[in-house]
Amino acid sequence: MRVGCGYDSHRWAAKRKLILGGVEIPHEFGLTGHSDADALTHAICDALLGAISEGDIGFQFPDSDPAYSGISSLKLLSKILEMVDKKGFAIDYIDSTVIMERPKLMPYIPDMKSKIAGVLKMPSDRINIKAKTNEGMGFVGRQEGVAVFAVALVKENQD
């Protein structure tokens, strides 16, 4: 078994959609980014890439490449699943924490889990998403952006 850790953060931006875990969440702001700026999916991508020793999302899908401009992060996650499979691993479990002051995410978490599970071809009960605030501290507390941590556990395929 291997473990990978992922982290991502994005600034708030006007005139952008807020997408987390592939789910569009109604909010007055979205997140800045070259892709759809889905910080949750990006952190999960980084955790999976770390677990299979393949760098990070910026290395695999550089923001200097116009092919990734505005791309759905779920498409990137799908490509990473192919890499996991090719390296001889299977995803066992994902745990993540989204840190933002608002909006409240609890109503959207089941849909996020379902979308991520669908892309990763795994049961949604093997994906955990927690939502926390930063109690008014730091850049998250000042509502300048969001931060996400993720951990992925992968195991070698037993062929």
From Swiss-Prot:
Q: Which Gene3D superfamilies match?
A: 2-C-methyl-D-erythritol 2,4-cyclodiphosphate synthase
InterPro entries per the UniProt record, alphabetical: MECDP_synthase, MECDP_synthase_CS, MECDP_synthase_sf
Question: What molecular function does GO assign, one term?
Answer: 2-C-methyl-D-erythritol 2,4-cyclodiphosphate synthase activity
The record lists the catalysed reaction(s) as:
4-CDP-2-C-methyl-D-erythritol 2-phosphate = 2-C-methyl-D-erythritol 2,4-cyclic diphosphate + CMP
Q: Which cofactor does the UniProt annotation name? A: a divalent metal cation
Residues binding a divalent metal cation are: 8, 10, 42
Domain of life, source organism? Bacteria
Q: What is its EC number?
A: 4.6.1.12
Disulfide bridge partners, by residue number:
none
Write out the entry's keywords from A to Z.
Answer: Isoprene biosynthesis, Lyase, Metal-binding
Which residues participate in 4-CDP-2-C-methyl-D-erythritol 2-phosphate binding? 8-10, 34-35, 56-58, 61-65, 139, 142
According to UniProt, this protein's pathway is: Isoprenoid biosynthesis; isopentenyl diphosphate biosynthesis via DXP pathway; isopentenyl diphosphate from 1-deoxy-D-xylulose 5-phosphate: step 4/6
UniProt site positions, description: Transition state stabilizer: 34, 133
Membership in a protein family: Belongs to the IspF family.
Q: How does it assemble?
A: Homotrimer.
The protein's name: 2-C-methyl-D-erythritol 2,4-cyclodiphosphate synthase
Tell me the organism: Syntrophus aciditrophicus (strain SB)
User: Coding gene?
Assistant: ispF
